[in-house]
Amino acid sequence: MSEALQVLASHITENSGGLALSSTVAFGELTVTTTVENIYALVTFLRDDARCGFINIIDICGVDYPERVERFEVVYHFLAPKQNQRIRVKLSTSEDKPVPSICPLFPGADWFEREAWDLYGVMFTGHPDLRRLLTDYGFEGHPLRKDFPLTGFVEVRYDDTVKRVVYEPVELKQEFRSFDFLSPWEGTDYVLPGDEKAAK
């Protein structure tokens, strides 16, 4: 299988007109890297080229690397049913650099792009309806970013007295704790019942 993927990777690199920056085959999966400027043209090539035939979109997701200048990776997964092959396409972007929407090519990308925007804040230009999908309408921030607080900003609950959902500041029942991983629970010296069997 990896030999067929190597052949496909060479075909994409040689025939896409420089749209693919690099390609790797690892663990039986082909990954192609591109740029924000080339994503639309590369996806069009992958769909329309007879050798590729990636006509099904499986997923679009985001990854946050806060230490990078372009902190977000947008990862696309496609399927070519005739060839029974999958491909992963990656690109890097920043908070203020939008990615062209591929909804005109794959209408099924609509909700995937909305999810990536909702959870990571990756903007998609040309998207028909870029609004929140999983979080509430008034939600502030993007919860899968590494710098988003674990507790969030507000607590949402249903109040039975007013018969509606209410938003309140987060109230923790106990303080955050700094855990000492060199605690006395690690590496105990006392003997437990049954330990004498292991010593023999």
From Swiss-Prot:
State whether it acts alone or in a complex, and with which partners, per the record. Answer: NDH-1 is composed of 14 different subunits. Subunits NuoB, C, D, E, F, and G constitute the peripheral sector of the complex.
Record's signal peptide:
none
Quote the protein name from its UniProt record.
NADH-quinone oxidoreductase subunit C
Q: Which reaction does it catalyse?
A: a quinone + NADH + 5 H(+)(in) = a quinol + NAD(+) + 4 H(+)(out)
Q: Which UniProt keywords apply?
A: Cell inner membrane, Cell membrane, Membrane, NAD, Quinone, Translocase, Transport, Ubiquinone
Please name the GO terms that the record assigns under molecular function.
Answer: NADH dehydrogenase (ubiquinone) activity; NADH:ubiquinone reductase (non-electrogenic) activity; quinone binding
The annotated topology with respect to the bilayer is: Peripheral membrane protein
EC nos: 7.1.1.-
InterPro entries named in the record: NADH_DH_suC, NADH_quin_OxRdtase_su_C/D-like, NADH_UbQ_OxRdtase_30kDa_su, NADH_UbQ_OxRdtase_CS
In which broad location class does this protein mainly occur, judging by the first location in its UniProt entry? membrane
Which class of enzymes does this protein belong to?
translocase
Which locations, inside or outside the cell, does it occupy?
Cell inner membrane
Identify the gene encoding this protein.
nuoC
Q: What does the similarity note say?
A: Belongs to the complex I 30 kDa subunit family.
Name the SUPFAM superfamilies on file.
Answer: Nqo5-like
HAMAP family per record: NDH1_NuoC (MF_01357)
**Lineage of the species this protein comes from:** Bacteria, Pseudomonadati, Pseudomonadota, Alphaproteobacteria, Hyphomicrobiales
